[in-house]
Amino acid sequence: MERQRSEEANRRFKDLNPSSLYDNLSKPDLGGSSELHTYMNDTSLADIPLFEDTLASEVSSSLISNPSKNNIQHLHPNTSEPFKTSSKSDEYDSYPRTGNVPTFSFTELNDTSVSGFGSQAVFENSVSPLSNPSNSPQAFDLTQGSSSTHNANDFTVNNVGSRRQSIYEFNIGIPSSNIDSSQFLPVSRAIAASEISPSSSPQLLTSFLPSGSVSNPSSPYLQGSVGALYEADAFNFVDVMSQASGTEVDSERFPSVDFEDPSLLMENQQNITGTGSFADYLQPPSSGSLGAFTNASPGESNTGIDFDTDNTNLNPSVDLLSNHSTPSFIFENSPSAEFSHQSSPYLVPNSGRTLNSENARESTIRSVNSPFSEDHADASLTTHVFDPISPTALSNSVLNYDSNNFSGTPQINVVPSSPSKSQSGPSLPANPLLQTDISITYSQSASPVSGQPAMNENSYDLQNANLCAPEMSPTYTARHRSNSAGSRFDAYEPIPQLYTHFSHSSECLSVNQDTELLGKIENDNSKSNDYLSVRNTRPRSRSLNSLVGNKSENSSSSKAKSESKSQGNYVCTFAGCNKRFTRAYNLKSHMNTHTNYRPFQCSICKKSFARQHDKRRHEQLHTGIKAFACVTCNQRFARMDALNRHYKSEVGQNCLRTATERGIQVPPSRKTAVASTSKQK
């Protein structure tokens, strides 16, 4: 008889609309529905699963079974606030209940927003039977293993029919001490769940399994075992590993988010306790808090990823590309140290060694086995990385080196250089100040030079005329430069001015088609005749070598050499400026003043200068040190040019005369001023 009454009550309750149940309970006399009265009289409330979206909390059976109590405004005995249909479970305290009816929580859409993902439905503040103090006298902690105070009867309910499974979660096994469920990503049904089985299909003996399928809950982060409810000690555990595999689902929901970012992955695991690397969380423990979960076979869980349990130690990822990064350029005008193995970890030995097991150890990084392809499950990445510094240069344990294999690694000095530009013919650029195609070397000639064409000082006909270079000082050495990217003028070497008054024994200049100044002048102090020859690195169809001069005019050559040195071989070719310089560096610095190119900047006030020594003198003004003093009046100056201006003034002239009369030694740089003062007398 009791069984028949229970079946009849189940049939009636199955056809009852939950919203009408709430409407009837809200009436003071509870008389709105005779069907509800009949059901309530025949069935104990303890046999009815209660849902928070219907009653907002569990209602004591004494309040419902006694229709004379009209205190429906305060159904909950522990609060004075009337319940609301959208209330959360944490708004009410726990109280004694009867029976083994589990409590279910419903998370409304847009209940809570997750930072970075907008407003989405999230699983939060869920209630499980284990949180009831009457049923759980002992706190349930997954870290201590399955509690012995619970059995399978705690999770059985009367078969009362379908229960809107798509909006309920049966969260019986959330490990409150390990994971805060409010930090999960937005809840959504697994993509495969809607395709495998409809959400309205009841499964197994109870309809309170996760959404639609026993193996596909509505949250991709609550993955449970198929047979979880059949075993007394195997609860519906939270799958920690699914937080890593869940990115496959999230990548389709959030295509604009890079889920491969390690910082984003770790953000979703901030509440996982424990130490170790991220790979440690990808290894299912053999025992402990998740022991029951790991007992399930791979086919019984939705972890989304397989693991090679035989290889529990995964080497951390290594950024191998950074070991082959391009080193920073050292610009010409910047004071920098030698670019050597002490200052760069990127040098690779180039002494002809081959990559083999004798002189280099292979650095193997084992890849994680892919669950999608068995053919590549054992694939691994093998790289050869060389470090010429020392075995401790890269401290990662994956990379091992032998320092003896890299002794004598050459030091490299890097200077930026733009790609070479070939020319159709031997011609100068539009700006004659830029030297592009000159390569100079010295070699001895046994044949005499003869002939010297007359040349205009401002004309350059390289195809039809022989170019004769000026007499070079024995101490002159060509400066090696390379073209820098951009419109930097300091990367080019100005062409020495060409003259027509050279002797027949002067050196003759020849030009090739190279784009960089590659030549080096090797001076020979012997009295034999020298000439300049072209050393071209590319095939050439014509030779521009020419021999001019006459051996009989050696005396006039020496005279012209001394005159050229006194006058200056390097002349500024800007209109209206015919200044001469004895050094190419001085001419280049002077050209910067015309182009307004000031590469040297004060480190304090950021003022720019065309010459480096001007910048250094300027920086002394900031220090307040006045290192230059007059030998007579002891007036001090921060710069030498200021002291020289003092000596040229009327007061300074008197100081120099006084110093001469007193026999005070004047610095060598001041002798010229003293001599000029004496001549004026």
Swiss-Prot record:
A GO cellular-component term linked to this record: cytoplasm
Signal sequence, start to end: none
One annotated GO biological process: intracellular calcium ion homeostasis
A GO molecular function held by the record: 14-3-3 protein binding
Start-end of Low complexity biased regions: 416-428, 550-559
UniProt KW Transcription keyword: yes
ZnF region ranges: C2H2-type: 570-594, 600-622, 628-650
Keywords, in A-Z order: Cytoplasm, DNA-binding, Metal-binding, Nucleus, Phosphoprotein, Repeat, Transcription, Transcription regulation, Zinc, Zinc-finger
Cellular location(s): Nucleus; Cytoplasm
Superkingdom classification of source: Eukaryota
Residues the record lists as Phosphoserine modifications: S543, S546
Description of post-translational modifications: Phosphorylated. Dephosphorylated by calcineurin which leads to rapid translocation from the cytoplasm to the nucleus.
Biased composition (Polar residues): 66-86, 340-358, 528-549
InterPro entries: Znf_C2H2_sf, Znf_C2H2_type
Biased composition (Basic and acidic residues): 1-15
Protein's UniProt keywords contain Membrane: no
PROSITE patterns named in the record: ZINC_FINGER_C2H2_1, ZINC_FINGER_C2H2_2
Chain residue ranges for the region called Disordered: 1-29, 66-96, 340-372, 410-433, 520-563, 662-681
Stated family: Belongs to the EGR C2H2-type zinc-finger protein family.
Function according to Swiss-Prot or TrEMBL: Involved in the regulation of calcium ion homeostasis. Binds to the calcineurin-dependent response element. Transcriptionally regulates pmc1.
Stated name of the protein: Transcriptional regulator prz1
Gene designation per UniProt: prz1
